[in-house]
């Protein structure tokens, strides 16, 4: 789980042993681990959305895969190539005063782990690369739809025949083109011969340290789901060439990718909170009053930022919803509640779940716990023991755009201000 802690306007991203990005490990660790990264440049959603879908939509059946979808999350949030300069130009020499010094060192240490044998960086590039000039969008100065290597071979490295490997990937990509103009090419930057910019890149840092490294670029002229489609075809071929087995949870077509991305965006689970296709603006959300805001999110591209008196929930470089907080002391008094759905026998439900009802629901009374059905009443009284139908709740208090999902919150009753325990969502279905 990825923890996001916000102090006023400062947002700190943390996961595992790394302080600035999420490292997601799939499969079983071994000495042949492929590392896939996205988001080193925050204005390339095809790259970071692909890495995130790889982490969330694949099962590794043999071998080991590491995924970092959000190498530069602050820049992703701002839709910026780099809020502190281009991070992908900071892997040669870097001043100790650079604000990204620590994260760059963390990325370097990850790449240098002995088990990492291949690095794949996912990027979005302009236009469509062509070896010879065709027009302003298809020429040698464009970076879209290419596989990039720094040199043809890397002696003594596993997968050191960089050119041969990348050519196999290009060949596979070109079997699945959506349009002939999307044709992929191999681009060798011959970095060691004097490409001053590429000498500073993450890929070349890996090369200098004996690790096979590749970059895949998808054209920025394509919609994001088509970029992701091409990126994942490339990643799958690299994984096959590295002997990594996998199962995919969606169909690898533009439509299948778009559906998977939309589903991933529609359900955000963050600790005590759930957001299902949330409205662009929500009412009061109970947050901790201890001076620290904690969100334990299961999605590496979800972030929380504060803007004056509101909070924004980001998914990648989109703001999914905004909400106004109401501050409470938190309580862990219970972790489940009893509920009757559609007049059937009551059942226990773990907090943090979404349940469905056709006609009605009723929260069973529990001593010391106050139930608050958002949109039903106007005063802070216990609303358990009441059979609630959809027409009894004001639709403007719904969580979702379809006005079918409603919050039910639970509080520990105290002599002063009640403490927030948690919530469930109730969806009225037809």
Spans of model-derived segments:
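Structured catalytic-domain cores with a bias toward divalent-metal coordination
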Residues: 2-6, 16-430
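Hydrophobic core
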Residues: 9-13
